[in-house]
């Protein structure tokens, strides 16, 4: 029980740090004291650092190789931050240590944020960070033999926007192009599983509003900026123009992509759900988890949902789920 409470507290901290575009900029903070700095997890040095999987300066990853004489499973970590901030070490901390201790290698990826994707001509902008993650996954698989990785047993994880990206990978049809001249593009983008913290499970503003009336997140993913003169918020514009972007929602919203052949998923939230009611943190509400779990159950996709007071909790933490799934005996 204590372990579960600690895990939920960690999810809460992750949500605060991963608000990204949803939150106003905080005032400049004073430098951390030595005591606070000492409390931050110290990450082991990567086996390989700043490995480029693409030409953009942000298309890089770190790789930590688990000690093993046979190919290891892999945690594919995607940091949060609203696709607007954060870096490849954000939120990785204790999860990295747990994986390495259990002979699971780890990759953590950097990717283009919404402004960078927009500058590169990605339409809609969210295509940039999502397809960067897919390309990074293919890159890892292309180097599986060299890095001693079991290319089948790859589980994705992350918080907030990184969690949304992980679920998108989990549910999206394979992006592999078997006829490509590029050997990396021939690799699969399918996962073994995904275990995420506080994900946004839909990018459909109408669903968000129905599930959580005070929703306000997601418009930036599709290039909406609102209009201050008209007192039109980013989300208001997103909702008003929803019908013009239905094909984008169908392609980039995790909820819309769920089908019966998808890998299993796990979600953890720091507060219990309250469907149809305003939430203190509508961007990271467990309402997202409840509705995705309903969809997964209807499609026959295994889906575990954890929050304070949740019934039938099998795995109290992301790490416990990943270790169980990635290290399970082959049938």
Positions of PLM-derived features:
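Mobile cap/lid helix-loop segments that gate and shape the active-site cleft of serine hydrolases
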Residues: 40-45, 56, 175, 205-257, ...
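Primarily recognizes the serine-hydrolase "nucleophile elbow" in alpha/beta-hydrolase
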Residues: 135-213
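Catalytic nucleophile-loop/oxyanion-hole region of alpha/beta-hydrolase
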Residues: 87-88, 95, 107-151, 312-313
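N-terminal cap/lid segment of alpha/beta-hydrolase-fold proteins
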Residues: 29-69, 259
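Short substrate-entry loop that stabilizes the transition state in hydrolases
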Residues: 69-72, 80-118, 164, 176-177, ...
């Amino acid at each position: 029980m204590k372990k579960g409470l600690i895990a939920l507290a960690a999810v809460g901290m992750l949500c605060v740090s991963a608000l990204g575009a949803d939150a106003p900029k905080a005032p400049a903070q004073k430098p951390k004291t030595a005591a606070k700095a000492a409390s931050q997890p110290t990450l082991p040095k990567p086996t390989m650092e700043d490995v480029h999987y693409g030409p953009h300066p942000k298309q890089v990853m770190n790789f930590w190789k688990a000690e093993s004489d046979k190919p290891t499973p892999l945690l594919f970590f995607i940091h949060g931050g609203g696709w607007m901030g954060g870096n490849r070490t954000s939120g990785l901390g204790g999860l990295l240590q747990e994986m390495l201790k259990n002979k699971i290698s780890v990759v953590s990826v950097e990717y283009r944020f919404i402004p960078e994707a927009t500058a590169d001509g990605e339409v809609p902008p969210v295509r940039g960070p999502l397809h960067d993650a897919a390309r990074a996954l293919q890159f890892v698989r292309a180097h599986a033999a060299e890095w001693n990785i079991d290319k089948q047993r790859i589980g994705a994880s992350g918080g907030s926007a990184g969690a949304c990206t992980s679920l998108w990978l989990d549910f999206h049809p394979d992006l592999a192009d078997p006829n490509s001249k590029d050997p990396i593009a021939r690799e699969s983008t399918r996962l073994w599983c995904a275990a995420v913290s506080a994900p946004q499970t839909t990018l459909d503003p109408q669903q968000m509003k129905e599930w959580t009336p005070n929703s306000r997140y997601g418009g930036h993913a599709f290039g909406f900026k609102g209009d201050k003169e008209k007192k039109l918020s980013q989300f208001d514009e997103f909702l008003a123009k929803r019908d013009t972007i239905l094909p984008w929602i169908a392609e980039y919203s995790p909820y819309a992509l769920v089908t019966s052949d998808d890998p299993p998923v796990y979600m953890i939230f720091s507060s219990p759900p309250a469907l149809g009611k305003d939430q203190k943190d509508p961007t990271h509400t467990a309402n997202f988890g409840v509705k995705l779990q309903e969809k997964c159950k209807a499609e026959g996709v295994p889906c575990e949902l954890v929050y304070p007071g949740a019934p039938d909790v099998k795995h109290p933490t992301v790490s416990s789920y990943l270790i169980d799934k990635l290290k399970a005996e082959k049938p």
